[in-house]
């Protein structure tokens, strides 16, 4: 499998969006990829978390990386997280 590299943009949102690099890598390596806007790809993976986020407890965190597959690597452009 190709190495995964994170853009500066994606890395800049780790804290504010509440995802871990390992979660994103797991999503890309284990979930089905779907076409996304601008010729990019995305995928989604749910993680059980029981996390308090912005003062509310959530049972599930969904991580949705948006990325491109290049010849030698996968580049993560951004990562969205959803809590429910």
What are these regions (language model features)?
Residues 1-84:
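Ribonuclease/tRNase effector modules and their secretory precursors
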């Amino acid at each position: 499998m190709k190495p995964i590299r994170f853009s500066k943009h994606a890395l800049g949102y780790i804290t504010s969006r509440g995802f871990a690099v390992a979660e994103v890598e797991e999503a890309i390596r284990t979930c089905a990829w779907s076409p996304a806007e601008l010729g990019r790809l995305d995928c989604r993976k749910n993680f059980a978390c029981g996390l308090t986020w912005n003062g509310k407890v959530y049972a599930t965190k969904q991580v949705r990386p948006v990325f491109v597959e290049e010849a030698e690597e996968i580049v993560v452009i951004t990562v969205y997280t959803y809590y429910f």
